């Protein structure tokens, strides 16, 4: 068989798209880690910030230097969606370009010189994901495609198109097959998962996200359910009740804050304010004390003042997130905020440093407080020094001494030591 080298940048949805690519090519290609031997070299791209876009061109330039004669290079994903032909202009050695909603055309692209497809219109063939899984222990399952939110800073609606919910019967069938193949954890994917069910093609049965969670939890063999990314605006009482009460749903919630300032949130077109976010987050803490909450934060949005930044710090200190993904504002093409005057980079960098430093203090305290507790850990990863790692039900990364026979098992672990990112312990059974 021919050899495929595949590099994936960005979010879990890109990981699932890459799995789809491998499934589409499985009859002709098998994966390799050696790029110099690959017959086909693919990079699946991210465009949420400017840095991954720059990385694309540096990476494919490096690929071109080590590729073997006769091999092909393809660019897929979100950057392919919005740059399109420009990729050929900047890197004429690239053989084809496939947008984020066009990966099902990979077989055609490989066989067609200078093939390009960046259409973001709805096509029901997008629902037919292949069965290849990068991990035998958990299954990423798309429940929706695209986004209709139009946040002022975000390019995703321009790269992934309008929001469409995948019919529940397709999702449930995919989850059932994954469990039959050994997965114990189902990880649901979408830009705004808790808006699921708002936009179906008309002939499909209507179902909201809360009902979908219940249906998946009833599949025999499903032991854990995770999902990303919910939108704070759609965290209604029904959703919170099912999240906290269903024993199959992992008690970790990603709540993308973006800013703690009501003014900046309005400028970002987020649809909620500081008070709404705090109400949802603190209610969740009260309903489910063991929950871990992660978030996204953008500092130095063009309209962010010092007082606005202080509002963000207030939310950080009040919610005490277990994890934050924080970045300086990065202007993206085709967005409402693209041409707004930027805040001085020194000020932006300082705000990011203050935010991350304070969160490190919060995280150190959180991790220290886990010592002595017992967590059920789902082991998925071999680490260095004879260790095996996995995730607790609340999404803490836990590492123990052990061998590969632990992989795929859920076992109780008593936590004995904590670093900022990892808990260390011993299996108690």
Swiss-Prot record:
The keyword tRNA-binding does not apply. GO terms for molecular function: 4 iron, 4 sulfur cluster binding; metal ion binding; N6-isopentenyladenosine methylthiotransferase activity. Residues 368-429 form the TRAM domain. InterPro entries: Elp3/MiaA/NifB-like_rSAM, Methylthiotransferase, Methylthiotransferase_CS, Methylthiotransferase_N, Methylthiotransferase_N_sf, MiaB_methiolase, rSAM, rSAM_horseshoe. One of its GO terms (cellular component) is cytosol. [4Fe-4S] cluster 2 binds at residues 147, 151, 154. Belongs to the methylthiotransferase family. MiaB subfamily. Coiled coil: none annotated. Binds 2 [4Fe-4S] clusters. One cluster is coordinated with 3 cysteines and an exchangeable S-adenosyl-L-methionine. It is found in: Cytoplasm. PANTHER family: CDK5 REGULATORY SUBUNIT-ASSOCIATED PROTEIN 1, MITOCHONDRIAL TRNA METHYLTHIOTRANSFERASE CDK5RAP1. It catalyses: N(6)-dimethylallyladenosine(37) in tRNA + (sulfur carrier)-SH + AH2 + 2 S-adenosyl-L-methionine = 2-methylsulfanyl-N(6)-dimethylallyladenosine(37) in tRNA + (sulfur carrier)-H + 5'-deoxyadenosine + L-methionine + A + S-adenosyl-L-homocysteine + 2 H(+). SUPFAM superfamilies: Radical SAM enzymes. Keywords: 4Fe-4S, Cytoplasm, Iron, Iron-sulfur, Metal-binding, S-adenosyl-L-methionine, Transferase, tRNA processing. Residues 2-115 form the MTTase N-terminal domain. This is tRNA-2-methylthio-N(6)-dimethylallyladenosine synthase. HAMAP family: tRNA_metthiotr_MiaB (MF_01864). CDD domains: Radical_SAM. Residues 133-365 form the Radical SAM core domain. Monomer. [4Fe-4S] cluster 1 binds at residues 11, 46, 78. NCBIfam families: miaB-methiolase, MiaB/RimO family radical SAM methylthiotransferase. Catalyzes the methylthiolation of N6-(dimethylallyl)adenosine (i(6)A), leading to the formation of 2-methylthio-N6-(dimethylallyl)adenosine (ms(2)i(6)A) at position 37 in tRNAs that read codons beginning with uridine. Its EC number is 2.8.4.3. It holds the Pfam family TRAM. Its cofactor is [4Fe-4S] cluster.
